[in-house]
Amino acid sequence: MIKETIHESQKCQRNWDLGQSIAEEDKKLIIESATNCPSKQNLNYYKLHVIEDRETIEKIHEKTRGFGPIYSDYNPDLREENAYDPEKTGEMYTNSQTLAQMLLAFTKNEEGLIQREEDDDWEEDRAMAVGIAAGYVNVIATQLGYSTGCCKCMDGSEVQDILGEQPILLMGVGVADKTRNRREHQTEDFMFPTLKKMKNIETTYV
């Protein structure tokens, strides 16, 4: 079960069965995983917005339009030959993983950080903390039977206008639509490409 969770939680869910809901106890546990995971010196590097209001979710979703022609003919078996091409033009699509039943938005927290040195830069520590939190959410949500999808592709200033704070990461959590391929866009006629598994991470045992 745990091994299956590890591999299943890697996948980004692009469509949702919005007729279903997340159980309240499950919701609390998922939020706890995002707010009580490890961080450097237990400092609060981020704030968490738990968004369930459908109108707000859809407003944020509209600000994630940025996936499109640069990947439209991507061949996962020819990864190196299909490099990102910024010159391609065409229709851009939103990132529909953000349309889940619950949208988590991680935003910057500047309060409570200890200034140890004049040149302290918290960006690396913050990125690490958010990454750990997202990983916790991925695993816990998957163990509870839900799916997830992270999104960094957004108009940050527009999302900030909605949230009132600078966004770092958006993360959809919810009930997958089991009648569809997980890569199908929720509302548009588009199939997101998938990248061939290339994570043969060198591991050294001492």
Regions found by a protein language model. Give the residues of each.
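Small-aliphatic-rich amphipathic alpha-helix that forms the alpha element of a beta-alpha
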Residues: 34, 104, 110-161
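Glycine-rich phosphate/pyrophosphate-binding beta-alpha loops
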Residues: 38-42
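A glycine-rich helix N-cap at a beta->alpha junction
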Residues: 68-80, 163-184
